[in-house]
Amino acid sequence: MASNEVLVLRGTLEGHNGWVTSLATSAGQPNLLLSASRDKTLISWKLTGDDQKFGVPVRSFKGHSHIVQDCTLTADGAYALSASWDKTLRLWDVATGETYQRFVGHKSDVMSVDIDKKASMIISGSRDKTIKVWTIKGQCLATLLGHNDWVSQVRVVPNEKADDDSVTIISAGNDKMVKAWNLNQFQIEADFIGHNSNINTLTASPDGTLIASAGKDGEIMLWNLAAKKAMYTLSAQDEVFSLAFSPNRYWLAAATATGIKVFSLDPQYLVDDLRPEFAGYSKAAEPHAVSLAWSADGQTLFAGYTDNVIRVWQVMTAN
């Protein structure tokens, strides 16, 4: 891992009329980026890598009647899922932008969505304090109770073991708790206790061994999933809105209220602190990133901002 690597701002993607709340990429379609926004839409982008325009919008996904808070893609990039404050989820055909399925059952804003690698189970987390498990056809298989405040994020833990069919998911909430659940039995596996404030975001490492979680107090906690215990804490020094593990380096990116911090985890150091220039804003009112996604090859970091713009960084070797 070269310690002289830095991230360079390569371009922007503009098309949303509200905060860019979520971003998704897929290994199956490396030139596809999906974004979700407070403008109630999602946009699929074709990534060109051009210096003038890093990508172009392909289509807008319309149907939600309120803010779209989260989105994800199936591994092959053929289908998209979205979670909205209109209390529903949607499954979309990426090629056409048509809604394939609606998921109705949550009693409040749906904050988060994810899907397992076999595309057989969809999970959602809501301000109604529940996590729901769905089939791809929209049937609710289970409602998981355990959080006693808003569920802010849910994620499927990557499982690379070919002979292991178990599905573990993780969740975080405003109750300051991180939880792990076994989806084969729909049971809670572990509580991870240590945060002192609302948790906005959590994510699992690509090999499924680590969880990172963070929120209002700026403390990023790293957890060992198998041992069910805390490992160490990184200080982001500002509220954290999104976390993303690099797919091919021991890096963790954190979108904070003042910039995007990219941490190396082994050895531990700050790789970069991404703070683009914002013309025409006072320091206090500067936009900040609220969503992150790495490209599947780990060379590009996408960030969605509160000025409705997606900014694109590429990993470069510093001379």
From Swiss-Prot:
Q: Which CDD domains match?
A: WD40 (cd00200)
GO MF, one term, reads: translation regulator activity
Q: Which UniProt keywords apply?
A: Acetylation, Cytoplasm, Isopeptide bond, Phosphoprotein, Repeat, Ribonucleoprotein, Ribosomal protein, Ubl conjugation, WD repeat
Tell me where it resides: Cytoplasm
Where are the residues linked by the Glycyl lysine isopeptide (Lys-Gly) (interchain with G-Cter in ubiquitin) cross-link? 46, 53, 107, 137, 161
Q: What InterPro entries does UniProt report for this protein, alphabetically?
A: G-protein_beta_WD-40_rep (IPR020472), RACK1-like (IPR045223), WD40/YVTN_repeat-like_dom_sf (IPR015943), WD40_repeat_CS (IPR019775), WD40_repeat_dom_sf (IPR036322), WD40_rpt (IPR001680)
Keyword Ribosomal protein part of the UniProt annotation: yes
Map the WD repeats onto residue numbers. Answer: 15-55, 63-102, 105-145, 147-191, 194-233, 235-275, 284-319
User: Subunit structure, per the record?
Assistant: Component of the small ribosomal subunit (SSU). Mature yeast ribosomes consist of a small (40S) and a large (60S) subunit. The 40S small subunit contains 1 molecule of ribosomal RNA (18S rRNA) and 33 different proteins (encoded by 57 genes). The large 60S subunit contains 3 rRNA molecules (25S, 5.8S and 5S rRNA) and 46 different proteins (encoded by 81 genes). RACK1 is located at the head of the SSU in the vicinity of the mRNA exit channel. RACK1 interacts with the mRNA-binding protein SCP16. RACK1 also exists simultaneously as a homodimer in a cytosolic non-ribosome-bound form.
Miscellaneous field: Present with 333112 molecules/cell in log phase SD medium.
The UniProt entry's sequence similarity note says: Belongs to the WD repeat G protein beta family. Ribosomal protein RACK1 subfamily.
Q: What is this protein called?
A: Small ribosomal subunit protein RACK1
Q: Source species, please? A: Saccharomyces cerevisiae (strain ATCC 204508 / S288c)
